[in-house]
Amino acid sequence: MELQQKTKTDNNGLIPPYGGELKNLIIKDENLKNDLISKATYEFECSERNACDVELLMVGAFSPLEGFMDENNYNSVIKNNRNTNGLLFGLPIVFDSNNEQVKAGEKILLTYKKQKIAVLEVNSKWEPDKSLEAELCYGTNSLDHPAVKMIFNERGRFYIGGRVYGFELPIREFPCKTPEEVRSTLPSNHDVVAFQCRNPIHRAHYELFTNALLSDNVSSNSVVLVHPTCGPTQQDDIPGKVRYLTYKELEEEISDERIKWAFLPYSMHMAGPREALQHMIIRRNYGCTHFIIGRDMAGCKSSSTGEDFYGPYDAQNFANKCADELMMQTVPSKNLVYTKEKGYITAEEAKELNYEIMKLSGTEFRKKLRNGEPIPEWFAFKSVVDVLRRS
């Protein structure tokens, strides 16, 4: 089965979108839009997670999908990591509801904070086996896993699949560029390295993604796309709006032409290996050829025991297995530490040279933030610290 286009670049000299075509599901014809709205049987208000998925479908970030997965595709993805056409997918893209009356063939008007964003044309509705989904996608049924807890406690009883007709993107506190907009900013015929994060960027992160441009499998004159997720994450994470403000301040402070910035309205699942695959698919649609992946990417700890749900290299190993089929490459993140003698170097080099390693734990950092104590510049950018203190 042929899963990908054989060409390595599109007409603009960039990696082609996943499946070969960047989908744009936004309807511009006002008559068609009004007709779809008039034929909608139901009106559902989207949760923030739902709204993120609707937006990513509309702009083509989930290409080649043209809507929420139906039952057959859902089952195929959770069991095989592939849709029914054989394309790799890390996690199912589904719409949830408690409405018992909705049936195939009907249309649902989707709103977000009362804004009419899309119509979902239902072709499939089912009651999923959430225990099976949790076990296959997250490796556990424990409610101590944030996504498993979300599936059981937040999602509705039913899943709904069907074509999405987009009207307008959700109005957010932070602007998120579409794949088409990001692609227009990228250089032709050069590697584009994606850096994913869900927290404010500190010095170690900066060193990590700038060092990635020097990796053996990254060509010269390449760029890095810093592409943080600004949607829902874990309960104790910093709010998306605050994270966005730290990124904007840092973008101005760094002002490096090798670094491109965009923000992703994605809802984190903390699914470890499967989420690494999902992130790579999305970043390919945004024009990235490489993906930085480090220890315990998209991992999480049990809320009761504090134990990790995934091994430190599970995500990295799984991503490496999928990379060729995705026409992408992974860039392992180095374990960087700060030394008095030489600044940021690898932990292995610091140990070999017997250099003194400077450390500041997350707990200590937050304490200094709260108490207004000085934070060393080797650890955090002043602009980022200022935003966090104001918030």
Go through each PLM region and give its residues.
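Active-site cores that bind ATP or allylic diphosphates and position pyrophosphate for catalysis
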Residues: 2-391
